[in-house]
């Protein structure tokens, strides 16, 4: 995506290009999914760290404030789904942190911006999640997931992400009904 910006003070125009990852165009990312306690599976791609985690799946419908959500201690240990379709476009702004670290266990978005644009930004969301060992999942229909959580209530879930032995065993279990039942019991 390319956007033209007009700087009022300098009376100049500059062009900024953004690389945006969408669910269907992420060849360089690893396979990932979320498995809900009710057995539903939403497949997508990995960003941030990779591995296998469990937690309570919740959602937030905020159009901005992803930095505040990630650093809010009230989300401690939860898998948070962000319904707004593009996350990360204004980067990381330490002044906006609610605390000194990320508190969510997992983070789910429709798409994320690799090259944020903000004069205050200090990095991108993918690098930040990796640095704090937080698993991210992108490329899924976050609104469909939110509808399930809204109608059924919050429920436990598991994110499976990457190519580790643990992740590959969990992906294999999803294809076998008896192994899937064992996997669901771990949630």
Where are these predicted regions, by residue range?
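Polybasic, lysine-rich low-complexity intrinsically disordered segments
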Residues: 10-12, 16-17
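N-terminal intrinsically disordered, low-complexity tails enriched in polar/charged
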Residues: 10, 23-28
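RNA-binding accessory domains that recognize and position tRNA/RNA substrates
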Residues: 27-187
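Residue-level detector of alpha-helix boundary/anchor positions
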Residues: 1-2, 132
